[in-house]
UniProtKB/Swiss-Prot annotation:
Positions of region (Disordered): 1-24, 148-185
Signal peptide bounds: none
Gene name for this UniProt entry: nrdR
GO biological process entries: negative regulation of DNA-templated transcription
Organism in which the protein naturally occurs: Methylorubrum extorquens (strain CM4 / NCIMB 13688)
Cofactor note: Binds 1 zinc ion.
Protein name, as recorded: Transcriptional repressor NrdR
Zinc-finger ranges (unnamed): 3-34
Cofactor: Zn(2+)
Family: Belongs to the NrdR family.
Length: 185
């Protein structure tokens, strides 16, 4: 494999092990020319998928693009990376084993929304706002209404009129991080 740092033609595998869910093989590589170290992943690809976009254009399926779009929705959220990897692998496997060589971008978007709904509600709303092309605040209210109905059934949200518990004292008086604020004259 070519070195991504210096372009050297040969790299050596220093460590090879399966990922936690055994869906990929993780390899640590080193370049003998520049000493650069990097990681590669080897995954099973059941078939070459083609994505049919809304415009009618056909493009090859890109697992990395799927990963990036989920990562953007999850930015600054505390979700275990292993759960994200399982979500991406699950969506990819479902698409590849669907029996079709061609999949619509809508099917991919719906699969991502379904997965994010079970993973992180904020990421679900973020992704939905881009995927469904929200233009007005009402679009968000409608989505949050359906999300609230789902959560009400699970007992996660307080009923209207219920008291919302106050945050613990340590959350209110948490120490500040970083530089102290400058005094203004």
């Amino acid at each position: 494999m070519r070195c991504p740092f210096c372009g050297g033609p040969d790299t050596q595998v220093k460590d090879s092990r399966p990922s936690e869910d055994s869906s990929a093989i993780r390899r640590r590589r080193v370049c003998p020319d520049c000493g650069g170290r990097f990681t590669t992943f080897e995954r099973v690809q059941l078939r070459e998928l083609v994505v049919l976009k809304r415009s009618g254009k056909r493009v090859p399926f890109d697992r990395d693009k799927l990963q990036r779009s989920i990562d953007v929705a999850l930015r600054k959220r505390t979700v275990d990376p292993e759960r994200v990897e399982r979500l991406v692998s699950g969506i990819t496997r479902r698409l590849e084993s669907g029996g079709e060589g061609e999949v619509t971008s809508e099917a991919i978007g719906e699969a991502v929304m379904e997965g994010l709904k079970g993973l992180d509600d904020v990421a679900y709303v973020r992704f939905a706002s881009v995927y469904k092309n929200f233009r007005e605040a009402q679009d968000f209210q409608d989505l949050l209404g359906t999300l609230g109905e789902r959560l009400d059934g699970e007992g996660d949200l307080p009923e209207q009129g219920d008291a919302v518990p106050a945050p613990p004292d340590e959350a209110v008086a948490a120490p500040r991080r970083g530089r102290p604020a400058r005094k203004r004259a």
